């Protein structure tokens, strides 16, 4: 049976891989992104300013959601995010993710795949890891079937 799968962040490296893998299935794919992507006409694309997530049409049917969005950070920012950049980071990596998960839940989703980070922990003193832990916990309370991936950055040789 075909599912309606919402992919958030398909323009990024990990989200692009999720899209590539799901294209081989017999499911209906819906992309939620900031800009239109070059892909097959059979893939439904919703272009939105993530500040306006609440304006999305909740009559959309969604069975699963994959969330692979996040603020672009330098390697040093994984250790320390400057005070003046923290608000933007929290907005993308917590608020946007929470809102798209709520949207998907309101559209019928019961399954979520979330890209997070190794070491995510609500009690961490590291802003990056604390926010990742906070959103993981928020998502766990929201949907019944949760898959959290905590990939690591691979060094290029």
Protein language model features and the residues they cover:
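Conserved Rossmann-fold NAD(P)-dependent oxidoreductase catalytic core, especially the SDR/UDP-sugar
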Residues: 8, 13, 35, 79-130, ...
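Conserved beta-strand positions in the Rossmann-like core of class I SAM-dependent methyltransferases
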Residues: 30
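Structural motif
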Residues: 4, 63-64, 111
């Amino acid at each position: 049976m075909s599912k309606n799968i919402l992919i958030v962040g398909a323009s990024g490296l990990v989200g692009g891989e999720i899209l590539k893998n799901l294209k081989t299935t017999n499911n209906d794919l819906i992309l939620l992104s900031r800009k239109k992507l070059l892909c097959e006409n059979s893939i439904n694309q919703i272009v939105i300013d993530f500040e306006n997530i609440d304006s999305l049409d909740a009559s959309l049917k969604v069975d699963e959601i994959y969330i692979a969005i996040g603020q672009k950070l330098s390697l040093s920012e994984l250790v320390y995010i400057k005070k003046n950049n923290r608000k933007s980071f929290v907005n993308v990596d917590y608020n946007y993710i929470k809102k798209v998960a709520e949207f998907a839940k309101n559209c019928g989703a019961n399954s979520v795949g979330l890209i997070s980070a190794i070491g995510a922990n609500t009690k961490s003193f590291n802003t990056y890891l604390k926010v990742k832990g906070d959103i993981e916990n928020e998502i766990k309370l929201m949907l019944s079937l949760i898959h959290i991936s905590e990939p690591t950055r691979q060094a290029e040789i």
